[in-house]
Structures are given as C-alpha cells and as structure tokens.
Amino acid sequence: MKAIFYLLLFLFCFSILFVSCNFNNDSDDTTEIDCPAEIASRAFRFAELYKDSDTVYELGGQAPVRSAIAIDCSGLVVMCYKYAMVDTKYSLLVSDMTAAYMCETASSHVALEQMRQGDLIFMGEADSSNVSHIALFDRLENGNVYFIDSTKKDDISGVTCRYYAASDSRFKSFGVMKIQY
C-alpha cells in the first residue's frame, strides 16, 4: 500500500513537472515591431555623440562610446540602437548586423517622406543596386537628405553629418529598424 502511494506521488510530481515544461522549440516568446520614434530619436542622439567625439572609421569597428573610438557604418547604427534601448524592454533582432542584412531582414522599408530622425538610410555605389553602406537619417530639407554615418573617403574618416540630394542614385532604400521585446 505504501509502495503504491509513493508510486502515485512520484507520478503526480512527474506529471506536474512534465506539464510545466515547454517542449515547443518552435515558439518564440518575442514580438517583433517597427522601432518606435522615441527609440530612433535616441539612437540619433548617440550618433551625434560619436560624431562629437571625433570617432574615426574602422572597418568592422563597434567601439563603445567611452573607448578609443573607431567604428564602421553598420557598427555605428548597431551601437547607437543598443544604447538607445538601454533600460527599455526592447532589443535588436540580432546583436551584430551588416548594412545589407539590416536592409534585407531587420527593417521595414518606407518612403523618404515617412522617415523620422534616427531611421535607416541604405546606400551603395551609384551604378549598383547592392546595399553596402548605412546611415542614420537626420532630416529632409530643401531637396537634400541629411544623415550621420561613419565612412572613410579621401577627405573624410569617421562619423560625420553629411547630405546628398534626395535624387542621388547612391540611396538604395529607406527603412525603420525592426526591434523585439
């Protein structure tokens, strides 16, 4: 009789444990959304900090704001959004992304006229459709698109505020960062 009691108690405890376990490996407990304007704006403010810190360009760089700063274009965007989401329920879809990945997978495409400060600008060579560069949108003014990016050219190395004409063929797409909570 005692053995049956312990067997039933064991089966009861085991069934409680079994039912409480989540065996559905396909479920994802996160929700993916377009980044709220407040987070995009905060990301832009961090880009301004990088710019004001005389940050230089370095391919593959993702230096935090407080170190000897060297960063590339996608690293700038990733780090600014990471900082913007500190103390919020939000996070990036993945922790490191290229400009092309952000364009293809981690953003919702919008028209230039719908862009908010801190949203994403995808760029590439004028004669190519490939995305090879990314920047944070500042504003559209007098037919020019103003942005902050990290680049290395003959006359630029680092994070700067620049602009191109809105019709410039280097612009490939515009987007809102997708985030999760």
Residue ranges and their predicted role:
Residues 97-106:
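Short, structured beta-strand/loop micro-motifs enriched in basic residues and often containing a Trp
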Residues 118-119:
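Structural motif
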